[in-house]
């Protein structure tokens, strides 16, 4: 009798979790894409209407956009096609504001001047997509070990004050490396560029005169007669690869994925450490910056816009930045639902895992939660 009673008790006890789990589905279903999680439910994606989205902008983020758009076609059973053209951050924002693109991508947030030019009553939303790094990439034959740079040294190189690779200031930072007696050719972006903005933002923080003369902009006033300008990240990377003595600033992915495995150097950070750009050092910069209140325009003008340059912490890479999707808060019908679903998926764990494979640092989980909530505000 006792054994039968005990058996009944155990059976009833073990059934309790199943009853509880079954009741979770009672009444209103619990969504797999909960508010603020930044996770896109597969069935929701398959139920999207057939549309074609057009995006333009930052070349910084183009390598992962190319991956995301192909994967998203699969996720939506071929219903949502995404076209993305790397025209540069400036052009991407302009085309989006003119409604010639469904979304723009930019490595720098919209400025107060750009915001003032929006149609009356219009609002825009900035959605962080990935965290990346701008690296000083160079072509220096016979030098295999990564060179060490500081912010002030990069200022002197890119303003033409240091003209030879065997200059005493470069040699002092790189003892034991046989530097060639070769002219330095700085390579800049010819088009309005978020990569340029990130690079200049960092240089302006370490050199007040650079801020006053060259400025912090996606199209700064580089000194005349110094270096050469090339369009887009591909153009800069290509010129560096072809030109001995060249040095330019490009997103890390372009250096790592170049055919000739382009060399790039470390940069001394705020803590005085020589740091090479990699996923860990980029993540460290993001984590440190997310803790800081954003008081500098244009970052202070927008929710979820964070400045990552010259971040604190011994492990932080100092020339890190975010790339943002920029879109109108008020969206139209099926296209609006599709672009929000795409951004929600791109910033999900799945989308960020794909980004990591292309050498971008995943967005911090705390930020992804805020992104989900921000996407919920798009009408």
Language-model segments: which ranges?
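Bacterial N-terminal signal peptides that target proteins for export
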Residues: 1-13
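Residue-level signal for mature regions of secreted extracellular proteins and peptides
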Residues: 16-19
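C-terminal motif of bacterial Sec signal peptides marking the signal peptidase cleavage site
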Residues: 21-25
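Flexible loop/hinge segments at secondary-structure junctions
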Residues: 26-379
């Amino acid at each position: 009798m006792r054994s039968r009673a005990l058996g009944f008790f155990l059976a009833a006890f073990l059934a309790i979790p199943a009853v509880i789990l079954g009741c979770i589905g009672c009444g209103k279903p619990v969504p797999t894409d909960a508010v603020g999680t930044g996770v896109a439910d597969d069935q929701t994606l398959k139920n999207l209407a057939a549309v074609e989205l057009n995006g333009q902008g930052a070349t910084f983020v183009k390598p992962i956009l190319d991956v995301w758009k192909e994967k998203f076609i699969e996720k939506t059973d071929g219903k949502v096609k995404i076209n993305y053209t790397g025209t540069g951050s400036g052009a991407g924002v302009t085309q989006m504001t003119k409604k010639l693109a469904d979304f723009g991508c930019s490595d720098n947030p919209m400025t107060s001047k750009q915001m003032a030019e929006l149609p009356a009553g219009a609002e825009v939303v900035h959605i962080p997509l990935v965290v990346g790094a701008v690296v000083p990439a160079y072509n220096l034959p016979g030098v295999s070990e990564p060179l060490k740079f500081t912010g002030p040294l990069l200022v002197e190189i890119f303003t033409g004050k240091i003209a030879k690779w065997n200059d005493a200031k470069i040699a002092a930072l790189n003892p034991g490396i046989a530097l060639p007696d070769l002219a330095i050719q700085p390579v800049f972006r010819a088009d309005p560029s978020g990569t340029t903005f990130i690079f200049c933002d960092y240089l302006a923080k370490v050199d007040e005169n650079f801020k006053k003369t060259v400025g912090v902009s996606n199209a700064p006033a580089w000194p005349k007669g110094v270096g050469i300008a090339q369009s887009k990240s591909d153009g800069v990377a290509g010129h560096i690869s072809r030109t001995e003595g060249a040095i330019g600033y490009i997103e890390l992915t372009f250096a790592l994925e170049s055919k000739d495995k382009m060399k790039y150097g470390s940069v001394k950070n705020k803590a005085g450490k020589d740091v090479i750009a990699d996923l860990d050092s980029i993540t460290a910069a993001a984590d440190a910056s997310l803790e800081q209140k954003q008081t500098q325009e244009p970052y202070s003008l927008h929710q979820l816009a964070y400045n990552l340059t010259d971040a604190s912490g011994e492990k932080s890479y100092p020339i890190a930045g975010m790339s943002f999707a920029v879109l109108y808060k008020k969206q139209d019908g099926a296209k609006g639902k599709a672009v929000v679903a795409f951004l929600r998926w791109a910033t999900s764990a799945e989308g960020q895992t794909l980004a990591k494979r292309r050498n971008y640092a995943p967005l911090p989980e705390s930020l992804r939660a805020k992104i989900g909530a921000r996407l919920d505000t798009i009408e």
